[in-house]
C-alpha cells in the first residue's frame, strides 16, 4: 500500500478548518486572559504562547503552499491536534475563576430524571471490569485520537481534514 506522502495534492490555499477553529479559540481565550489579567498567575506567558501558536499556524500554512502534499497536510493537522494537550490544562486556569456549578447540574438531573443517572449506573454495574474500562478510556484519550487520525490519513485521506476538525471542535465545545 503506497501512501504517496510527497505526491502533490490539489487543495485550496489558506487555513484548514481545524486551524480556523483553533485560531478562534486562541483569540477568545486571549480576550478572556486580558479580562482576567490581574487575577491570573502567568498571563504574559499564556499570551506569548498564544501568539506563538498563531505564528506557527500561519508559518505552516505558508510552508504548505510551497509543498502541498499529504505529508505537509498531515503535519499541519497533527500539530493542531497535539495542541489539545496544551489547551486541556490551560482550561484549569480559567475554571479557577468561575464558580462550581456541579450543584446546578445535579439539580437539573434530579428534575429531569428524578434521580442521578451516574449513581444508578454505578449501582447497576459495580464490577471492577466496568470501572477499568472507563479508566482505560481516560488513559487512551489522546492515543485514541492519534489512532483515529492515522486511520483516516492512511485509508480515507479525503475525510482526514473533516475528521480532525470534528475532534478538535468537540474538544473546544
Residue positions per predicted region:
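Terminal transmembrane helix and immediately flanking juxtamembrane interfaces
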Residues: 1-173
Amino acid at each position: 500500500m503506497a501512501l504517496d506522502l510527497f505526491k502533490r495534492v490539489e487543495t485550496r490555499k489558506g487555513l484548514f478548518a481545524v486551524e480556523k477553529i483553533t485560531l478562534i479559540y486562541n483569540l477568545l481565550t486571549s480576550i478572556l486572559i486580558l479580562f482576567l489579567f490581574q487575577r491570573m498567575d502567568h498571563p504574559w506567558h499564556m499570551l506569548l504562547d498564544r501568539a506563538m501558536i498563531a505564528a506557527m499556524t500561519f508559518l505552516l500554512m505558508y510552508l504548505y503552499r510551497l509543498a502541498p502534499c499529504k505529508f505537509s497536510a498531515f503535519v499541519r493537522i497533527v500539530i493542531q491536534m497535539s495542541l489539545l494537550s496544551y489547551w486541556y490544562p490551560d482550561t484549569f486556569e480559567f475554571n479557577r475563576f468561575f464558580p462550581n456549578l456541579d450543584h446546578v447540574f445535579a439539580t437539573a438531573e434530579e428534575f429531569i430524571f428524578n434521580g442521578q443517572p451516574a449513581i444508578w449506573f454505578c449501582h447497576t454495574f459495580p464490577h471492577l471490569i466496568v470501572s477499568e474500562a472507563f479508566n482505560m478510556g481516560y488513559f487512551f484519550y489522546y492515543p485514541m485520537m492519534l489512532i483515529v487520525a492515522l486511520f483516516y490519513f492512511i485509508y480515507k485521506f479525503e475525510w482526514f481534514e473533516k475528521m480532525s476538525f470534528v475532534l478538535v471542535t468537540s474538544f473546544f465545545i
